[in-house]
Amino acid sequence: MIENNEFDVADLRREYTRGGLRRNDLTTNPLELFEHWLKQACDARLADPTAMCVATVDENGQPYQRIVLLKHFDDKGLVFYTNLGSRKAQQLANNPHISLLFPWHMLDRQVIFLGKAERLSTFEVMKYFASRPKDSQIGAWVSQQSSRISARGVLESKFLELKQKFQQGEVPLPSFWGGFRVNFDSVEFWQGGANRLHDRFLYQRDGNDWKIDRLAP
């Protein structure tokens, strides 16, 4: 228990000076602006620019978050892959509502997608799984994600065992490994601004079009 914490986080602050976001900077389709920002994040050599915070909820309404890598995006949605026995996959099976947050701190930016997740087809999953490095494929077999284990050595021993087993030939797709596509209907773009007057624009699906509103910071 920390009673007298000398590490005071209340005074940790900085100014956001990397520019603003104006309506004439926006695109008609939010995915076009997202792609532009993502490319800028890559050009800025941010660590893991495709990393997103994935939020789901359990049957009691308790939210959970974790970092997952985006693997594809287009007008159909945003795609990520995971162990189907994982907490997030189980929660999405019960409640498909999901939030994705891209935290590009070094650029004073963030993007939030809201929508529903749907399972990818076996063909889509197999196609991506085949493109992964072999060690990553084996890693998918090793971990029963979110289950309790006694020590890291359990994972390492299993990895070496399976690496020997799959030394020759291809690594098959685990039946418990798959992916999700997030069909989004809301996207918010946030750009840090001076004096905490941040710029926020919310895209909301309106039939085949997108309604755009500026939000107060």
UniProtKB/Swiss-Prot annotation:
SUPFAM superfamilies: FMN-binding split barrel. Keywords: Flavoprotein, FMN, Oxidoreductase, Pyridoxine biosynthesis. InterPro entries: Pyridox_Oxase, Pyridox_Oxase_CS, Pyridox_Oxase_N, Pyridoxamine_oxidase_dimer_C, Split_barrel_FMN-bd. Its cofactor is FMN. Pathway: Cofactor metabolism; pyridoxal 5'-phosphate salvage; pyridoxal 5'-phosphate from pyridoxamine 5'-phosphate: step 1/1; Cofactor metabolism; pyridoxal 5'-phosphate salvage; pyridoxal 5'-phosphate from pyridoxine 5'-phosphate: step 1/1. FMN binds at residues 66-71, 81-82, 87-88, 110, 145-146, 190, 200. GO terms for biological process: pyridoxine biosynthetic process. It catalyses: pyridoxamine 5'-phosphate + O2 + H2O = pyridoxal 5'-phosphate + H2O2 + NH4(+); pyridoxine 5'-phosphate + O2 = pyridoxal 5'-phosphate + H2O2. Its EC number is 1.4.3.5. Substrate binds at R13, R14, E15, Y16, K71, Y128, R132, S136, R196, L197, H198. It holds the Pfam family PNPOx_N. Coiled coil: none annotated. Binds 1 FMN per subunit. GO terms for molecular function: FMN binding; pyridoxamine phosphate oxidase activity. PROSITE patterns: PYRIDOX_OXIDASE (PS01064). Homodimer. Belongs to the pyridoxamine 5'-phosphate oxidase family. Catalyzes the oxidation of either pyridoxine 5'-phosphate (PNP) or pyridoxamine 5'-phosphate (PMP) into pyridoxal 5'-phosphate (PLP). NCBIfam families: pdxH (TIGR00558), PRK05679.1 (NF004231). This is Pyridoxine/pyridoxamine 5'-phosphate oxidase. It comes from Serratia proteamaculans (strain 568). The gene is pdxH.
